[in-house]
A protein has these predicted regions:
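ABC ATPase nucleotide-binding domains
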Residues: 82, 92-234
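Helix-to-loop junction immediately C-terminal to a conserved catalytic motif
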Residues: 56
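Conserved hydrophobic segment flanking the Walker A/P-loop of ABC-type ATPase nucleotide-binding domains
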Residues: 25, 31-32
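Short beta-strand immediately N-terminal to the Walker A/P-loop
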Residues: 38-39, 85
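Conserved ABC transporter NBD signature motif
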Residues: 64-72
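The feature captures the beta-strand-to-loop junction immediately N-terminal to the Walker
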Residues: 41-43
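Non-catalytic connector elements of ABC transporters
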Residues: 244, 256-355
Length: 355
């Protein structure tokens, strides 16, 4: 396993990029710790797969360097980087047995057959494949085949990093949680450096200790799932993570105080005066909004049941504000007042956190 460092990295598919929009991956510096579980999260086309292919050696970056531990591997081809990659669609040898699929990478490296057998059976047991080792891979379900793809990455003890590119795309929804749980369990037991690429926040937040959120080729925030949820550095992160997403409200800054609809709003950190002409917004998640005796006057529009909570949609003038209300909590019949938890309310200028 390895510590992965990306230094001054940029990539464009154009020979002579002339503007910022020509860069598929905009300038970034990232580091993933040795043995860590990480996720690259963002919408389709944001640069996730490009970045993954640069790390694996399938692409050479236009600018910058890729380091595995203290070694610059930027110029190394993929087959010399000791990486394993699991793709969206399971890549297996259908005519081979499950056993031979798992053994294939080891036999290619000339490992003695006794050692091959020991390692294959060890990994098969971890993946719950030991009962089907002699079956042909062609007869397995999609999740079974994806386990083989994963196993071929894990079976090699010299792998620096295992990378997953949307690995649950073709898996039935009711089986996804089982594979997610298995991946997490495997990481906790093996402590191999893993990078998981997905557009699904649930997959990213339940698997990774560190999540990198990308949008439009740019890293907008990197941190733990808790950090991304409680203090989004950009309104995109607030929208993209959470269900429902963060409330983003038009704001002004008057007398040194952020305001919504002319009403003062306390925020987590006393903000500096934002740049002149900046678009100002207040961000607060529905989890940190509550009804109170006073505050922002609103009208209740609709209530939707969501398990232990109800999602309440309210309106102040033309602005919609959502909050979560517990099952046993009383709701105003029509009109009420909203209060924001100061510790989780932020001011944003042109999308970026201002405090």
């Amino acid at each position: 396993m390895a510590r992965i460092s990306l230094k001054g990295l940029r990539h464009s598919y154009r020979e002579q990029p002339a503007s910022e929009s020509d860069w598929a991956v905009k300038r970034l510096d990232l580091e993933w710790a040795e043995g860590s579980a990480n996720a690259l999260l963002g919408p389709s086309g944001c640069g996730k797969t490009t970045l993954l292919n640069i790390i694996s050696g399938l692409l050479r970056p236009t600018e910058g360097t890729v380091w595995f531990n203290d070694r610059d591997v930027t110029a190394l081809p993929a087959d010399e980087r000791n990486i394993a990659q699991v793709f969206q669609f399971p890549v297996v040898y259908d005519t081979m047995s499950v056993y031979d699929n798992l053994a294939f990478p080891l036999r290619n490296r000339g490992m003695p057959e006794r050692d091959v057998d020991r390692r294959v059976r060890e990994i098969a047991a971890l993946l719950d494949l030991d009962a089907m080792l002699q079956q042909r891979a062609a007869g397995l379900t999609a999740d079974g085949k994806q386990k083989i793809s994963l196993g071929r990455g894990l079976v090699r003890s010299d792998v620096a990093v295992i990378m997953f590119d949307e690995p649950l795309t073709v898996i039935d929804p009711h089986l996804k949680w089982r594979l997610r749980s298995k991946l997490k369990e495997l990481h906790q037991r093996l402590r191999t450096t893993m990078i998981y690429v997905t557009h699904d926040q649930t997959e990213a937040l339940t698997f990774a200790d560190q999540v990198v959120v990308m949008n439009d080729g740019m890293v907008v925030q990197a941190g733990t799932p808790v950090e991304l949820f409680e203090r989004p550095h950009h309104t995109f992160v607030g929208h993209f993570i959470g269900s429902p997403g963060m409330n983003v409200l038009p704001a002004t800054f008057e007398g040194g105080v952020p305001r919504f609809a002319g009403l003062p709003v306390e925020v987590a950190s006393p903000p500096k005066a934002p740049p002149a002409g900046a678009r100002l917004e207040l961000g607060v998640r529905p989890e940190f909004v509550r009804f109170g005796a006073d505050g922002i006057p609103v009208r209740v529009l609709r209530v939707r049941d969501s398990g232990r909570y109800r999602i309440v949609e309210t309106q102040h003038d033309a602005t919609t504000i959502k909050l979560l209300v517990g099952e046993g909590e009383a709701l105003p019949s029509e009109n009420g007042y909203l209060q924001f938890d100061r510790a989780h309310t932020q001011l944003y200028a042109d999308g970026w956190i201002a405090s």
